[in-house]
């Protein structure tokens, strides 16, 4: 899942860096593995 998120994030960050990264960043940061 990490690889997928990495690709998606890299692609999406160009459009919605703040909302997208913030959502996944918080989720994964709080211990949301996969």
UniProtKB/Swiss-Prot annotation:
Q: Which GO terms describe its biological process?
A: arachidonate secretion; lipid catabolic process; phospholipid metabolic process
Q: How is the cofactor bound?
A: Binds 1 Ca(2+) ion.
Q: Which Pfam families match?
A: Phospholip_A2_1 (PF00068)
InterPro entries reported in the protein's UniProt record: PLipase_A2 (IPR001211), PLipase_A2_dom (IPR016090), PLipase_A2_dom_sf (IPR036444)
Gene3D superfamilies under this entry? Phospholipase A2 domain
Q: Where in the cell is it found?
A: Secreted
What is catalyzed by this enzyme? a 1,2-diacyl-sn-glycero-3-phosphocholine + H2O = a 1-acyl-sn-glycero-3-phosphocholine + a fatty acid + H(+)
Expression sites by tissue: Expressed by the venom gland.
Q: Cellular component terms, GO, for this chain's entry?
A: extracellular region
Domain of life, per the record? Eukaryota
* MF (Gene Ontology): calcium ion binding; phospholipase A2 activity; toxin activity
- So where does Ca(2+) get bound? 27, 29, 31
Q: Which UniProt keywords apply?
A: Calcium, Disulfide bond, Hydrolase, Lipid degradation, Lipid metabolism, Metal-binding, Neurotoxin, Presynaptic neurotoxin, Secreted, Toxin
Question: What modifications follow translation?
Answer: Contains seven disulfide bonds.
Identify the EC number(s).
3.1.1.4
What cofactor requirement does the entry state? Ca(2+)
Protein family (similarity comment): Belongs to the phospholipase A2 family. Group II subfamily.
Functionally, this protein is described as follows: Snake venom phospholipase A2 (PLA2) that inhibits neuromuscular transmission by blocking acetylcholine release from the nerve termini. PLA2 catalyzes the calcium-dependent hydrolysis of the 2-acyl groups in 3-sn-phosphoglycerides.
What is this protein's name? Phospholipase A2 B1
- Organism (species): Micrurus pyrrhocryptus
